[in-house]
Swiss-Prot record:
Domain of life: Eukaryota
NCBIfam families (alphabetical): Fibro_Slime
Descriptive protein name: Protein psiN
Gene name tied to this protein: psiN
Region described as Disordered: 714-746
Stretches that traverse the bilayer: 680-700
Length: 746
């Protein structure tokens, strides 16, 4: 037997074994030749959205969407708000704004038409990873004669105006989205090549960014994601979200290759795999509403897919009391259906008994507090002025305390921060021939003395060195006698002054006591009755729930009292009415779970802590989890992860409560033992192509020759693109000898 015939013999033995194994239905169901992947397509038009047929930069532009997916509706978030998306220069752009971008992936009446489709992914039997599936088309027009191009469409959009490079009318302008989930096993990849915009999110993170219209020449419009580089956790379920738009003539290309095992956790009521209910518009809901009620969309899985959701909307009446505070009560506005502050609620009414003092309310300041109308700061010395409110004008009026002239025998003046200084009017006219007295009504009186003798020359009575102790001539005998008058009285009836008489001038001196202020925000004052110093603190605003502060430069400022007790499980508030506790109140904090997938409890140090719920599971080979989109517990098959997922797959056994790992059969050539590779005797590269290339195809090739293989290829709708994929046509695949080529061409 020649060398070629020996190789062929060993190969046919191996091939027969493969054919027998592939007849096993369990293996075929594990890795079917085809998978239908559900997608949603929105037909758009340059007439409804100017982002389509926009100037073509013919290059990928990154950063058109944000790195994080909008988890509320699993849609990409436009990068730039109301601004244009950037392009290669300032004068051109590829997206107008967030409003035009919105209709790419959201239902919008008269702007887009929603079409449900599925893409058939085919297992790549020539790959060294049996999990690889691909979808490829160089004429990707999945909604030709649909949407705006459908015969039944009678709207304003012009039909059949966009043609491909061969002149055939095509439905060029659409956006596609695919939502699924997967259990990360290890070794998965996702590759794409095509036009135009493509974004891929895994675990809500952007992992492939191919934005803007572009062609597929060279490396343009292609990229790959290796999931092992994403920091994913094996056996954990992750969301997968794929977005694709065809925005520009004249070609449409798509090539997707992936080993990710897509699953659909649920279908929403719109019939979309892992959809977020985008078909729902609450304004279209059917039913009656209370005065302040409004409609909300149903829960994603509350009704069966494609059931008319308009009859199943939720009626929601807002509980406005949840927004109430001490100062603000809320009520529902029937027009806006929103909670708004009540204009009738006056919590501080009657709290003030003066029109010069306003009763105000501020929750940060503890509720009701009193605020004075503006005062004259030049008259704020209460030792000199008494303030009163003019209730008619609601203004402060001031009366000087030391300007009382009802007693003309008493002289009064105000000493700042010490009060009134009162002294007896000095009625001495220095005339010994008068009797000096004082009337409180008229003041000083000087009555002449009859038969008064003038002072003789040389009388020394007026030459006293102490002018506070006055001497004057005896009006009846002025020769030698002097009359000693009473020492001058300098008592001003104010305990805050030191009263003395200046002997040289004879004037009274009433010197204020020195009182020192404690800080720059205080004024030192003396009590005119006791003579004791008092400190008047200007920063006391009289509000229990504020902390009165004084800055270094003497400016008063006020901080809300936090009443912090150091316990994160209490709600600490301050109310001015709680005088017994200094205003502070500490009520228990109620921790609400953020959704039905969580429970919540309070930790004194951390506050409210969210804990995922444990969903019940009925068997070892099932796992359960709470889905963040539906907020419900779901069940899935337990993933069994082999050491090398490209060579083995895992099967869960409920009886043994263990995962069983089996080799793929036929085993990919890269996974074969050295003995098998030697027995086949084919170069490693060629054998890889032959062994994994599909046992059915190889069987036809081996036993039916070229014609049998070509007939099978034709029956598969040209899924194999070139004749060179037939091993009978390739003498040296990957630099190795092909025994089938030699045997069929000898």
């Amino acid at each position: 037997m020649g060398n070629i015939n020996k190789k062929l013999f060993y190969f046919l033995i191996q091939l027969i074994t493969i054919l027998i194994v592939l007849s096993d239905d369990s293996y075929n169901s594990l890795l079917p030749l085809e998978k239908d992947i559900a997608v949603i397509i929105r037909d758009l038009s340059p007439q409804t959205n100017p982002d389509f047929e926009i100037d073509n930069p013919n290059r990928v532009i990154k950063g058109l969407v944000k790195d994080q997916l909008n988890e509320e509706d699993r849609s990409p978030i436009y990068c730039c708000g109301d601004d244009h998306a950037p392009n290669i220069d300032r004068n051109r752009f590829v997206i107008h704004n967030q409003s035009t971008f919105y209709s790419w992936f959201h239902n919008q009446k008269d702007v887009n038409i929603v079409i449900s489709k599925s893409l058939v992914f085919t297992r790549n039997v020539t790959s060294d990873d049996p999990r690889i599936y691909s979808y490829e088309s160089d004429n990707f027009f999945p909604i030709d004669k649909m949407g705006f191009e459908a015969d039944s469409y009678n709207g304003p959009i012009k039909k059949n105006q966009w043609k491909d490079r061969w002149g055939f009318p095509r439905n060029f302008h659409f956006c596609l989205e695919l939502h699924a989930s997967f259990f990360y096993i290890g070794g998965e990849l996702f590759s794409f090549k095509g036009d135009d915009d493509v974004w891929v999110f895994i675990d809500n993170r952007l992992v492939l960014d191919l934005g803007a219209p572009h062609d597929v020449s060279g490396q343009n419009g292609q990229g790959s994601v290796y999931l092992d580089n994403l920091g994913l956790e094996k056996s954990k379920s992750y969301n997968f979200d794929f977005f694709y738009c065809e925005r520009h003539t004249t070609d449409s290309h798509i090539m997707v290759e992936t080993s990710i095992d897509f699953k659909c956790k649920y279908y929403d009521y719109c019939g979309v795999c892992e959809g977020m209910g985008k078909c729902c518009n609450p304004s279209e809901c059917y039913g009656s509403l209370p005065a302040c009620g409004h409609f909300e969309c149903p829960g994603l899985t509350d009704i069966a897919p494609n059931v008319d959701w308009r009859y199943h909307c939720k009626v929601v009446v807002p509980n406005c009391s949840l927004s109430d505070t001490f100062c603000v009560k809320h009520q529902c506005d029937p027009d806006s259906k929103q909670c708004v502050p009540s204009t009738d609620y006056q919590p501080c009414q009657g709290k003030s008994n003066s029109s010069c003092i306003e009763a105000r309310c501020d929750d940060k300041m503890g509720g009701c507090y009193l605020k004075s109308k503006p005062k004259d700061q030049s008259k704020n010395d209460t030792t000199c002025y008494r303030e009163t409110c003019n209730e008619d004008t609601s203004t402060w009026e001031y009366k000087a305390l030391c300007e009382d002239d009802s007693d003309k025998c008493i002289s009064k003046k105000c000493i700042p921060n010490s009060g009134c200084s009162s002294s007896v009017v000095d009625c001495n006219d220095n005339n010994h021939c008068t009797i000096d007295s004082c009337s409180k009504d008229t003041g000083c009186i000087h009555d002449p003395i009859e038969n008064c003798v003038p002072c003789v020359e040389g009388n020394k009575c007026s030459e006293s060195s102490d002018k506070c102790q006055q001497l004057e001539c005896n009006p009846y005998n002025s020769t030698t006698e002097c009359i000693d008058r009473t020492k001058k009285n300098c008592d001003d009836s104010n305990a805050c002054t030191i009263d003395t008489c200046n002997g040289e001038s004879g004037e009274c001196e009433n010197t204020p006591k020195q009182c020192l202020a404690k800080n720059k925000c205080s004024t030192a004052r003396c009590n005119s009755k006791t003579g004791q110093c008092d400190n008047i603190y200007h920063c006391d605003d009289g509000i229990l729930c504020t902390l009165d502060k004084c800055s270094e430069n003497g400016t008063c400022y006020y901080e809300a009292n936090p009443c912090d007790d150091g316990d994160q499980c209490t709600i600490d508030i301050c109310l001015n009415t709680l005088t017994e506790t200094g205003g502070c109140s500490h009520s228990a904090r109620v921790c609400e779970p953020k959704n039905s997938c969580f429970t919540s409890h309070c930790d004194k140090k951390l506050g409210c802590v969210q804990t995922p719920i444990e969903c019940p599971v009925e068997a070892f080979c099932l796992i359960s989890f709470c889905d963040n989109s539906t907020k419900k517990c779901m069940t899935a098959d337990r993933p069994c992860i082999p050491d090398d997922p490209r060579c083995q797959y895992g099967v869960c056994d409920n009886d043994t409560k263990a995962c069983i790992f089996k080799d793929y059969d036929p085993l990919p050539f890269k996974c074969q033992s050295a003995a098998v590779k030697a027995a086949v005797g084919v170069g490693a590269g060629a054998a890889a192509g032959i062994a994994i290339g599909g046992a059915i195809a190889l069987g036809l090739a081996a036993f039916g020759g070229k014609r049998g293989y070509d007939a099978w290829k034709s029956s598969r709708d040209n899924q194999i693109q070139t004749s060179s994929e037939n091993p009978l046509y390739n003498p040296n695949p990957n630099q190795g000898d092909n025994p089938l080529y030699a045997a069929n061409n000898s």
